[in-house]
Amino acid sequence: MRENNQSSTLEFILLGVTGQQEQEDFFYILFLFIYPITLIGNLLIVLAICSDVHLHNPMYFLLANLSLVDIFFSSVTIPKMLANHLLGSKSISFGGCLTQMYFMIALGNTDSYILAAMAYDRAVAISRPLHYTTIMSPRSCIWLIAGSWVIGNANALPHTLLTASLSFCGNQEVANFYCDITPLLKLSCSDIHFHVKMMYLGVGIFSVPLLCIIVSYIRVFSTVFQVPSTKGVLKAFSTCGSHLTVVSLYYGTVMGMYFRPLTNYSLKDAVITVMYTAVTPMLNPFIYSLRNRDVKAALRKLFNKRISS
């Protein structure tokens, strides 16, 4: 009964990125620009890939799915932050907080596993080109995407259920602009030892794709450096450079946030979360399209179709 009453009456206060009103105004304007750019950029990538038959291959199928996840990922937190700032409110219900946390964990994990699938795709294309179409068949690609979604949601569910069982009887100010598991655990007045262990287990599951990416690129570069011509090296960097940039941005900020003790977390760390929740999803379409002739050509065709119609 107490837990049911808590879920219906408890509200959290989202302190924002810095907790300072002047700086929050700056981040409001920043997010007001970032969010539509993220939506439009990633949606254009999806439409360009779907509309151009030349891009109907595993590499671009995975890229289109990454763009879809980035749209959902940024939509979990930014609209709520913008709405709260506009309404002069910082509150979020207990149910809304758990929902936000669930989708952030699920989509964050899904994103990381799709990035691993993309690295595997490049490794197969460069190290086993004759078997590429067999290994990266349409069925295999669908299984890779489906598996990414299943693992992402399977990792998010236990964390959400465990957090829902906690009691919050004191300070209800969340040191972030959205409901993240780390500040929520710090607010609880329950015994959180098991929850912290589960959180680090989740971090371990989140690290598996990074290990897969590292192994894939070791395979890529070991194959490329065996090629006597420098063209092989340049081709590898041209096809893998964009992906490596995205992986570095994403995992660099996430590792800075979660690969450390819970007690070290503070409101100052909320600035780090802006990078992987807002900035990285916005930059991904530019990173993948600016250095990719096929994507740029598909985007031009897409715009020409819209103009001519």
Swiss-Prot record:
Recorded name of the encoding gene: OR1A1
Biological process terms in GO annotation: signal transduction
Q: Fetch the SUPFAM superfamilies from UniProt.
A: Family A G protein-coupled receptor-like
What are the annotated glycosylation sites?
Answer: N5, N264
Enumerate the transmembrane spans. 26-49, 58-79, 101-120, 140-158, 196-218, 236-258, 271-290
Example GO CC term: the record gives:
plasma membrane
The GO terms this record gives for MF are: G protein-coupled receptor activity; olfactory receptor activity
Provide the protein name.
Answer: Olfactory receptor 1A1
Q: Which UniProt keywords apply?
A: Cell membrane, Disulfide bond, G-protein coupled receptor, Glycoprotein, Membrane, Olfaction, Receptor, Sensory transduction, Transducer, Transmembrane, Transmembrane helix
Source taxonomy lineage?
Eukaryota, Metazoa, Chordata, Craniata, Vertebrata
Which family is it part of? Belongs to the G-protein coupled receptor 1 family.
Which residues form each disulfide bond in the chain? C97-C189
The answer, when asked if Lipid biosynthesis is one of the entry's keywords, is: no
Give a short account of what the protein does. Answer: Odorant receptor.
Q: Where in the cell is it found?
A: Cell membrane
